[in-house]
Amino acid sequence: MVSGHNPQDAEAKRQPFAQAAYGTVGLETLLSVLLSLHHAHGLDLATLIRTVTGHPARLLDIDGGTLRAGVCADFALVDLEAPWIVDADALQSKSKNAAIEGRKLQGKVEACFVNGQIIFDSKMEIKK
């Protein structure tokens, strides 16, 4: 499972349909959209997490997607219950075109760490 995240700035999207750049925000909404499968349909949480962590890492032959000694500590802190509404203007991506604009989601990333260093905190926005 991947986001297909391919953000485009407003000018690239403000073209006749056939000439407009393709792409939409996906990275910032992927986990919350997947969590909707957990909340609404009972998808096992461990399976969901493996789908976006360990499985892609193995497919790409990346030593990651897991928390274990000797592997970079890349992880997210998630509030599984936090409700929020997708507001493209509030997203951090350069793209403001969200296919799910206005959709109510449950579950929100509160912080992200790469190699053990915080790069995003929902209270303070992007660090790096």
What do these predicted ranges mean?
Residues 1-3:
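Hydrophobic faces of well-ordered beta-strands that scaffold small-molecule active sites
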Residues 5, 128:
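Catalytic pocket of metal/acid-base enzymes, prominently hydrolases
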Residues 6-82:
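His/Asp/Glu-enriched, well-ordered alpha-helical/loop segment
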Residues 16, 72-127:
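C-terminal cap of metal-dependent C-N hydrolases
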